[in-house]
């Protein structure tokens, strides 16, 4: 099997690091210059909805049960790896859409008096920023 590296093509540091990689590089991100990319990103019932494209065109649409742009990136990475392994998009869709997130990562505990209570153990400034950004958009 060929050596393959998957990286966030929207991240300039990842692209810089890839300059010295001799393996095949497959990119994912929000920009259409990536091998796998998302468009029409919008809030869904509980998380994010978006269309997934690759070099052949529209693969399909995904609806995550978890919010945040960072989770769109995570889903795109999953799609890229699974597609490379020749897993049909419908199988990828079923798996990705059934993922409910890690415990205590933007875990919705319920709604009380019109206020949604969320448990999140984010302990790093980058994680806290992603959590707050996701909360503002849901």
Task: Kindly give the residue locations of the regions a language model identified.
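Acidic, Mg2+-coordinating active-site environments of NTP-dependent enzymes
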Residues: 1-117, 137
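AMP-binding/adenylate-forming catalytic core of the ANL superfamily
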Residues: 121-138
């Amino acid at each position: 099997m060929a050596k393959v590296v998957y990286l966030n093509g929207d991240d300039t540091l990842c692209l810089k690091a890839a300059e010295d990689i001799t393996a095949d590089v497959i990119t994912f991100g929000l920009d259409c210059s990536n091998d796998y990319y998302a468009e029409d990103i919008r809030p869904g019932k509980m998380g994010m909805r978006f269309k997934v494209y690759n070099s052949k065109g529209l693969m399909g649409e995904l609806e995550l049960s978890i919010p945040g742009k960072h989770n769109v990136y995570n889903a795109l990475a999953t799609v890229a790896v699974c597609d490379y392994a020749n897993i049909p998009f419908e199988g990828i869709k079923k798996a990705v859409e059934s993922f409910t997130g890690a415990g205590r990562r933007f875990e919705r505990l319920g709604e009380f008096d019109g206020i949604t209570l969320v448990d999140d153990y984010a302990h790093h400034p980058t994680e806290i920023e992603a959590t707050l950004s996701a909360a503002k958009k849901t």
